[in-house]
Amino acid sequence: MGIWDSYQQRINIFGDTQRDTTLSREQIRLRNYLPKNLSFHTAIVNDMEQQVAIINSDNLNEKTIISLPGEDLTNGSLVRWMDNYWLITEKDANVTVYAKCKMLQCNHLLKWVSDDKVVREQWCIIEDGTKYLTGEFEDRQFVVTRGDSRIAMTIARNEYTVNFNRGNRFLIDDPDSKHKLAYALTKPLKLGGTYNNQGVFKFVLQEVTATDDDNHELGIADYYKIFEEPQEQQQPSDSGSSNEKKRWL
């Protein structure tokens, strides 16, 4: 390598253009600066440890999460941080320097039986849904339901939740409640928070009557439609079988 080639290599170490040079220097600056910032944390993103910056907002259950330069964050990812689960619900498409997303604190572990007859569970966000229309249909007429029996659910899109549809039932309540409330999905909006097949679904559910097919102990609706309910074992009578004859001496 000649002197001129060595010179060219040195001046192009940060890029061939002025823009590339500016970008490289900014990425180096952030990599050196972020670990010293109080917003710098180590979180578990989709079961993988990742160093990120987490910035507070006016809402305590909403944060901004920023990746290190050269790393990425996916819309719909589940983040474990500060002994809580958080769901990434929005992502800035401009990832030139870093990935910037909004994440919300999860408050419910949804449980259901998937089409392959396997019990699934996934963290989601449950909110009051009285401001939404339920999307119910009755006698081919659109029905607007009033009252306080609606909830909104935000959940990550994946191969299992993509199959959720109108009429799917779930038990959604405090996990320690003995008799959990049942809800049916009435507004399966699947395009409001997904981009390039990544992101979150935003559903509206209406309270319905619980049935004998619901397993309140496990928190799974329609559980006994798929799995047999355990039969109560009959205790033998002290007097013996009803067919047994007594003999008197």
For each feature predicted by the language model, list its residue ranges.
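N-terminal intrinsically disordered, low-complexity, charge/repeat-rich segments that act as generic
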Residues: 1-115
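Short beta-strand-centered aromatic/proline hotspots
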Residues: 49-54, 84-94, 168-171, 177-194
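Short alpha-helix capping/helix-loop boundary micro-motifs
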Residues: 61-75, 148-163
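Short, solvent-exposed secondary-structure boundary/capping segments
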Residues: 62-66, 93-106, 189-210, 215-217
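Loop/turn positions that initiate beta-strands
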Residues: 76, 165-170
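Surface-exposed beta-loop interaction hotspot
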Residues: 84-159
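Internal mixed-charge
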Residues: 163-166, 179-182, 190-192, 197-201, ...
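Viral virion structural and adsorption modules
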Residues: 216-249
